[in-house]
Each structure stands twice: as C-alpha cells, then as structure tokens.
Amino acid sequence: IGSGSGAAGACIVRDRLAPDCRIVGVQSSAAPAAYLSWRAGQIETAPCLTRHSGLATGRGFELPQSVIVAGLADFIIVDDAEISDAARVFAHLAHTLSEGAGAAALAGLLKATSHPDRVAVICTGGNASADEIADLARG
C-alpha cells in the first residue's frame, strides 16, 4: 500500500461482489504511514525511507483510509529486501516484470505464516525503473 487507493478500491469491489473475501494490505517497513494510520484509526505520519517509489508515502491519505480502516482483514509489513526478492520471484518464475510496489503483495504472501485455501495476489505496478530492471537481470 502506498496511498491506499488500490486497496480501498479492492475493498469496495469485494463488498459488492464477494463479501466473504479477506483483503490483506502490505506495506514497506521503510514507509509505514498507511499501516500506522490503519492501526490507529486516524491519519498518521512516519518517515518515508523506502527505495520503492510506488510505496513512498509519509502520511496516510484520508479518503483511502476511510475505506481500508474497516475493509482490510489484516496488514503485513515487509522490508525493502523482501519486496525486491518478491520482484525477482515474479520476474524469474512468473515471467512478470514488476516494480517494487507491484511486488509488495507477493512479499506479504511469502512472509505470511498461514494461508487460506485460495489466495490471489494482485501485481499492481509494472513501472520498473532501469535500476530495478538491472537488479532483476542480475538475479
């Protein structure tokens, strides 16, 4: 989660089409403002030190937070290295080029200690920078 608009949209669609579906947010520990806002139930600020630009927010966003505060079943915090590892998994095993923000959901799944029978991971970003692509090529 960066601003939270994607997660909020997923919650709105879920409420209409599949109310039993659980949505779990994932955010970088190096930019935890959305997580802190969700946990507190109010807008929070936090240092933004992540190298994954799509997740780089230093303050929770009011409109998405108003939806995800009740809409998310859980929230997983991952570090930037776990996000980069997930981007490599996408590239090498799924043949999908993802920026770090797009790989965050997979990083959360890989970190989770338990999984339900069926899981969907949404890869939300394919805007990898030249540096990210070079890192993926190095493996």
Predicted feature residues:
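Short beta-strand segments
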Residues: I1-G2, G25-Q27, V121-T124
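Short, acidic Gly/Pro/Ser/Thr-rich loop/turn segments
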Residues: A8, A31-A33, E62, N127-A130
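Phosphate- and divalent-cation-binding pockets in alpha/beta enzyme and binding domains
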Residues: G9, A33, D85-A86, A107-G108, ...
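Active-site/ligand-binding loops adjacent to catalytic centers
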Residues: R16-S98, L136-G139
